[in-house]
Amino acid sequence: MKNVGIISLGCPKNTVDSEKMLAILKEKGYNIVNDKNKADILIINTCGFIEDAKRESIEYIIEMGKLKNRRLKYLIATGCLSERYNKELLKELPELDAVIGTGDFPKIAEVIEEIEKGKTVLEYGHANLLNDEGIQRILTTPNYYAYLKIAEGCSNACSFCIIPKIRGRYRSRKMEDILREAEELVKKGAKELILIAQDTTKYGVDVYKKFMLPQLLKEISKIDGLKWIRLLYAYPDSVTEELVEEIKNNEKIVKYIDIPLQHSHDEVLKRMNRNTNRQKIEEVISRLRSIPNMVIRTTFMVGFPGETEEEFEDLKQFIKEKRFERVGVFTYSREEGTKSYYMKPQIKKSVKIKRQQELMEIQKEISYQHNLSKVGKQLEVLIEGFEDGIYYGRSYMDAPEIDGVVYVKSNKKLKAGDFVVATITDAYEYDLVGEY
């Protein structure tokens, strides 16, 4: 029995694809290993969204290629980088035995059979035809939380983004399929389901001809044993009144939303082809703020082509004024195949980094003040582990791996997956400390 390992890079959407590949291979009799040094076959599920992600994926491929001097026999690249650079990857990285695009990963077992016959395999170009419905998953996350992908692809056509070319047009899954999978995940022990897609708020527009996310959330919340539902990748132009009401009134939906805004200035938003404007963004924020204790996570992009000092200043003031609880700031990455690649003037890297640092400094203080306001209050915490004599976990305000943690001092015997109500005693810029 051959050992197969997988390294999943990039976003949670990739994680789900990796989990499906593992299930396919296990069913075919392969042995799944977590230690790359024990693998006969290693799959790297790559990210190819921006420059840093591409570099990381390529570095991993080169690094893992060195294992071929030892036990490793075959190295396969899947995911976004593979879809985007297909033939080029095979040509430039001789370590690779196969390259599989985003729409072709269900063929993983057949591809391995082919490379074992001595062939080099290239499969790509079918992003729009991906059919992975009904494929089981072997969870790579701890069993108490799981990602639930509700749609594939994107049709938003932002001028800086290559995703529609890599992942295809927006395709919602059928509600009954999502609900079946959600029930299975909860049966396996998931207490938190994290809804993901390139754009979760557009769910249903293609299949049902209307926004169906509120209805989907309502149905998922009926599952016994499920405690938290978390919403990531919401798109500002599709946050409806109905969605806000569902989040507000549904006890299982955590009062947290991840809603990438990208910028505040109308001219920049127009160049980005964001299909929204400052006024609409203000309205969405105000709608969300009507939900008590709502935590808004957002991301902004600095150094977009033509971003003037005045436009950057506008963004700076916007962040100061809106006081988002969670903010990520990215520097614009010039990607071939996007409309913004040809826009002028392109901003110098040094300016982009300076702007990023400026915004993060502002946000650091906002985040600290927000955390400080929690001292003396009680927060429910999902325990995730124990390290250096203290437990750590997440509150409703924290998504896994992207937000902070809550450290919990306790003499009680706790285990990962337990929910406890901690009294917050101390605050840092991104983390909290509590007692239970």
Curated annotation (Swiss-Prot):
Sequence ranges assigned to domain MTTase N-terminal in this UniProt record: 2-117
Domain Radical SAM core: 140-369
Molecular functions (GO terms): 4 iron, 4 sulfur cluster binding; aspartic acid methylthiotransferase activity; metal ion binding; protein methylthiotransferase activity
Record-linked CDD domains: Radical_SAM (cd01335)
Cited PROSITE patterns: MTTASE_N (PS51449), MTTASE_RADICAL (PS01278), RADICAL_SAM (PS51918), TRAM (PS50926)
SMART domains: Elp3
Organism: Thermoanaerobacter pseudethanolicus (strain ATCC 33223 / 39E) (Clostridium thermohydrosulfuricum)
Reported cofactor(s): [4Fe-4S] cluster
Protein localization: Cytoplasm
Record's cofactor remark: Binds 2 [4Fe-4S] clusters. One cluster is coordinated with 3 cysteines and an exchangeable S-adenosyl-L-methionine.
Name recorded for this polypeptide: Ribosomal protein uS12 methylthiotransferase RimO
Domain TRAM, residue spans: 372-436
Record-stated family: Belongs to the methylthiotransferase family. RimO subfamily.
Gene Ontology CC, one term: cytosol
GO BP terms: tRNA modification
Keywords assigned: 4Fe-4S, Cytoplasm, Iron, Iron-sulfur, Metal-binding, S-adenosyl-L-methionine, Transferase
Residues annotated to bind [4Fe-4S] cluster 2: C154, C158, C161
Function statement: Catalyzes the methylthiolation of an aspartic acid residue of ribosomal protein uS12.
Binding site for [4Fe-4S] cluster 1: C11, C47, C80
Chain's gene name: rimO
Catalysed reaction equations from the record: L-aspartate(89)-[ribosomal protein uS12]-hydrogen + (sulfur carrier)-SH + AH2 + 2 S-adenosyl-L-methionine = 3-methylsulfanyl-L-aspartate(89)-[ribosomal protein uS12]-hydrogen + (sulfur carrier)-H + 5'-deoxyadenosine + L-methionine + A + S-adenosyl-L-homocysteine + 2 H(+)
EC number: 2.8.4.4
A Pfam family this chain is assigned to: TRAM_2
